[in-house]
Amino acid sequence: LIEELEVSPSSILAITFTKNATNEMLDRLIVSADNTGQYEEIITSKSLHKIEKEQIRYLQQKKYKWIDSLTVRTFHSFCYSILRNYGVNEFDNKFKIIGDEKRDEEDDLSKNVAPETVFEVIHKLLIEQCEDISYLLQLKRYILDYIIDKVHLNKTDNKFIPRDGKYYTSLDGTKVRSKSEQFIADWLYRHSIKFVYEPLLNVKDFYFRPDFFIPDANLYIEHVTDKSYSMANKEEQFHLGNLLLVKTFENMTNDSALFNHTLDSILKNRLPSNYFKTISLNFKEEFNGYHENVKDFVTQIMRITDMIKVENIEIDNVLSDARKDQHERVRNFYELAIPLVKKYIEYCTNKSYLDFNDLISRSTSLFKNHEDIANKYKHKYKYILVDEFQDVNNLQVELIKLLLTDQSQLFCVGDDWQSIYGFRGSNVNYIVDFENHFPNANVVKLNLNYRSTDNIVGASNEVIKNNKNKVEKEVYSSKKSEHKIVVFAGSSEEENIQFCFE
């Protein structure tokens, strides 16, 4: 463009995904301009520290004016500069960047980083949300059921069948055999009533284990289901020992209000009145021993927050759709998640924080609402290059389209085979269906692989051809090899790691 068509370097925008990719692009440009070959030796040197290379790269970039006039940025860095210059029309232009981790890079984004990470904020908000006892107990029940016990997998995966038949964990950590018994144990726990689960009892003739014993009421509870053994012999033993036995029945559990009332009636006149005060619960005590599981939950909140922003979905619509899901686990998760997502967004707005998705969404919003600002960028950048296009998401494509005019030239490089970030919101359809998203486009397929051997490329062809959503192409290798591919499937993660190590 610059050499043959004499295009002004300042009219070229090159967008990448990572800082490393940006540096690599700049390095290639500088190497192409450096006739001495010294710069290539510098960037490949193992004796120079990363910071030293950054400093040399900066000086070399300034040395070549045409390179310095180019705009080579990540999506986030590009949007950061837009919002710093014009963000007052959309948000607080003194915003700080909040990310998944603390940044130590020497770039614009790192200079204005928030003092806390996304994880730290959501974790803090989760603790605050758990001041609502109802929420705290729902969260603990979710973690116990679906992260600890994995009850949604018990019926289909033998790996999760416990030897003692006790699938379910109650709020106090007691393992029980059914959801109904879990309900009873949880009810007792919430009302600060001590209990013993399946105590070993011998009244006269034989040993047996009633379901629950309430010491302070000297009362036994048997929960009867269609899977229960006959109660006749047990009831006779209770009668002989003059012991108090109360039975609950499975059909009562169909109505939680009725079951609550039943348990209340059973114990109402058998315990002091102060037993019916709700137990004092707090986050630290309830989740002691479950810290890693809470971290997993927070990580899931971070993920769906990203997806909501990338897909630009109304938060309330997410919850209403989730409530219709056929799976209880999904319904329960979103009931817990959406209040936190809302609080996180409110918190960040109040603190003038923008996360990486916000940088792009706020920039697109700025362009849509302020045509004069959008036109400045449209007129400046006539030539736009996007690298790793297979990883773009909806927000990023929307931003690109807002930069285009009839005179713009868009050049995208990508490989649908390398699309691995769908879990983060990337949409491979943009490269597979490129001509529909960008009409009048010319698609060039590069089918010669210079990196891998023919055995690897051949196997890849065989695997990828099963993909439904792909660019039709046959890839060939420039390298021959006599080494065959070795397939190893270990029985555990540790075994797989050991194989790779050896």
Predicted features along the sequence, with ranges:
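Coupling/hinge elements of helicase-like and P-loop NTPase modules
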Residues: 37-57, 92-104, 132-140, 273-285, ...
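Conserved helicase/translocase motor-coupling segment
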Residues: 499-502
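Conserved helicase NTPase motor core
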Residues: 13-16, 21-22, 26, 71, ...
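ATP-hydrolysis module of ASCE/P-loop NTPase motor domains
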Residues: 63-71, 86-158, 253-336, 443-445, ...
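Short beta-strand-loop-alpha-helix junction that forms the active-site gateway
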Residues: 209-236, 240, 323-327, 417
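Conserved RecA-like helicase ATPase core segment
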Residues: 1, 394-493
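P-loop NTPase Walker
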Residues: 1-90, 375, 429, 458-461
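Catalytic cores of nucleic-acid endonucleases
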Residues: 225-270
